[in-house]
Amino acid sequence: MTYTLLLLSVILVVGFVGFSSKPSPIYGGLVLVVSGVVGCAVILNCGGGYLGLMVFLIYLGGMMVVFGYTTAMAIEEYPEAWGSGVEVLVGVLVGFVMEVALVLWAKEYDGLVMVLNFDNMGSWVIYEGEGSGLIREDSIGAGALYDYGRWLVVVTGWTLLVGVYIVIEIARGN
């Protein structure tokens, strides 16, 4: 499971590096949809079945509509791919090398083990016992997101705002 999660995380980051290298809107939308599917697979791999399904339906449904309009507005006769510019290809390769270096650095200093073992989850456990519980981890995760991850919510909101700005700029053709 650890290697599957690590592989999905690397694919997710490489997909976002591929999207941020500003290819044609057709290819950018495809990479963003594939990265969204991989992100949902990460959530499913961590045990969040309901959350993974909701992210899949809401995020990918919205992105399909946005990129459908973007592709219709910014249609090109010869769309620009990642290999058409040397600087774009170098940017993708540098991003990939940085990701591999980060994984190797985290593995060398036992940072990867600390992240993937989940040793400090004692404060998240609400129901312990032999019987069946009525509280699922998905609903606990939403509460923990707003309790422990206040800045994560702020960064997520800012990222969504920047994403909307990028989509508008791509649709205008700049």
From Swiss-Prot:
The chain crosses the membrane at residues 1-21, 24-44, 47-67, 86-106, 151-171. Its main location: mitochondrion. GO terms for biological process: mitochondrial electron transport, NADH to ubiquinone; mitochondrial respiratory chain complex I assembly. InterPro entries: ComplexI_Subunit6, NADH_UbQ/plastoQ_OxRdtase_su6, Nuo/plastoQ_OxRdtase_6_NuoJ. It comes from the Eukaryota. GO terms for cellular component: mitochondrial inner membrane. It is a multi-pass membrane protein. Pfam families: Oxidored_q3 (PF00499). GO terms for molecular function: NADH dehydrogenase (ubiquinone) activity. Its EC number is 7.1.1.2. It is found in: Mitochondrion inner membrane. Coiled coil: none annotated. It catalyses: a ubiquinone + NADH + 5 H(+)(in) = a ubiquinol + NAD(+) + 4 H(+)(out). Belongs to the complex I subunit 6 family. Core subunit of respiratory chain NADH dehydrogenase (Complex I) which is composed of 45 different subunits. Core subunit of the mitochondrial membrane respiratory chain NADH dehydrogenase (Complex I) which catalyzes electron transfer from NADH through the respiratory chain, using ubiquinone as an electron acceptor. Essential for the catalytic activity and assembly of complex I. This is NADH-ubiquinone oxidoreductase chain 6. The lineage of its organism: Eukaryota, Metazoa, Chordata, Craniata, Vertebrata.
